[in-house]
């Protein structure tokens, strides 16, 4: 899936459910929640959870969980960017330019 297609799909999906009605401060809160879930998935994949109250998952299930949580983070970033009239392509271009400039003499 191309980045622009993914953005379009996410925006339509979120709008259909009324999820775009939340303002930027609430959206950032959701982003932080998803970042925490991604951190949990990374931990499970890298060092395990060591929780007797949780079912141990296979490596494939852990990787799928990583992918899904990354998608949740990207989805929230895409919706937040859209609130400010910015595309993910704009975000990535600015990020690339910032890092290139910052480290051009390193």
Curated annotation (Swiss-Prot):
Coiled coil: none annotated. It holds the Pfam family MazG. It comes from the Bacteria. InterPro entries: MazG-like_dom, MazG-related_YvdC, YpjD/YvdC. This is Uncharacterized protein YvdC. It comes from Bacillus subtilis (strain 168).
């Amino acid at each position: 899936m191309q980045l622009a297609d993914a953005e379009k799909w996410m925006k339509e999906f979120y709008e259909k459910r009324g999820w775009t009605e939340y303002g930027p401060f609430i959206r950032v809160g959701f982003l932080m929640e998803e970042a925490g879930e991604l951190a949990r998935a990374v931990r499970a994949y890298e060092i395990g959870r060591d929780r007797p109250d949780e079912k141990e998952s296979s490596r494939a299930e852990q990787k799928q969980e990583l992918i899904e949580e990354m998608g949740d983070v990207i989805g929230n970033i895409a919706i937040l960017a859209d609130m400010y009239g910015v595309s993910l392509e704009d975000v990535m271009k600015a990020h690339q330019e910032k890092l290139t400039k910052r480290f051009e003499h390193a």
